[in-house]
Amino acid sequence: YKRQPIGKATFVIANNKLTVSGTPFAGHFNGQGYRIRNLKMVAANSEEGATYGLFGTLAPGAVIENFSFDTGCSFTVASTAGSSNGVVAGLVYDATVRDITSSAPMLFQGAAGNVRITMALIGTAFAETANVTIDNVNNNGTITAENRDNNTNGGATGYHIAGIAGFTTNDGASQQKVIISDCINYGDITSATGRTAGIVAAANRYTQLANCVNHGKQLNTCPKNDAGRLGNIACNMGAGSSMIGCSNYGDLTSTTGSRCGGITSAAGDATFENCANYGTILTDSPYRGVFWGYNNAVAQWTDCTAGGKVGTYNANAPVFDSYADAEQANYLGKQGANQSALTNIAYQIGNSGGGSAGGDAELRILFIGNSFTKDAVEHLPGILKAMGIDKVKMTHMYYGGRTVPEYNNGFATVNDYRCYECNPGAAGWTESMNKTIKEVA
């Protein structure tokens, strides 16, 4: 039985214009919290511009929400033509995807030559007359990407692999955005492609990332030296794009000298605020950094934390970079003639995030609530850090839209919260899953 996606359609993006043919899904699908089990999806498309996933293409105004894929599901991309593939949806066009978690492993075995194929939870997102919303979409599944025909392109025609979205962009005459918020990738990545990231492989145009976190480690073996452009949040940031409150905790290792950054490979002229890297970045390329790999544009970095480490891969015997205080901006990444603007950067080189183990706390605070609570407590770690208060441990159990009776009734059994923790002395929150309120209390 060959399964057809819901909303079967094909697409073409040319000169920043999108054309869709077929019958995209235009409705509202609410999974009501149900879990999809044992669904094995294989995208073996030979048709140029095919879209594949549980949903193929979402039409403007469509909404899909509130369901999950269990570990018995899987997603394999074996396309032989340029296509867009996502566990949830292949193409999201002026539509909304929210409150979805996948634990399905993803496997890329595509081979189409020098053309773009995407694989993520959402293959491609395109905004024209309305914003695209991708909110609270999370990946727990491992990601494996082969490179069967040696496509070594680290640019637009490379194979785009990511935890959340493969390729995001907008219409060339529009200022509508692709908004990706509160998304987490826990999936470790083993990839041989030139564009691979934890959250978005290519934030091409007018993409806004907010409060997204990558915990997945990436090992990349792109088969050509200096071909890959790798970042653990996004590989590149295009015109009109921004990143707010995003953090990377995953290590990024290139064995073949790809350009690597903990946050992004190429920052462009994007704005970054309250972002942080705590991962270890290893590549033999001179274009490496805890923030970006190489950039020759005036990006804006404000109130960001430079943690983790950076150095050479050196045949798996790492040699870490070391700079004097006056030169510590070199940890961030290589710059061309156009220099990025750096404001209030906290250098914590060697810090993998999370502060101490929490045993020295003299005060412990537990917050339970939704997005209003999250907004209220978001900056408390930085405030306490600035005040020199390092004896407070804070935990926030977050679930959007949950009512007070639901928190109470599921006190010891419900574990679908996002657990944000700030250990004593830490400057930010660390996210985890699968904990109950009783466990953290």
Where are these regions (language model features)?
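Surface-exposed repetitive/solenoidal architectures
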Residues: 2-359
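Residues that mark the start of a beta-strand
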Residues: 362-364
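Conserved beta-strand elements of the Class I
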Residues: 366-368
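Catalytic nucleophile serine of serine hydrolases
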Residues: 371
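Conserved SGNH/GDSL esterase-like catalytic core that processes O-acyl groups on lipids
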Residues: 375-441
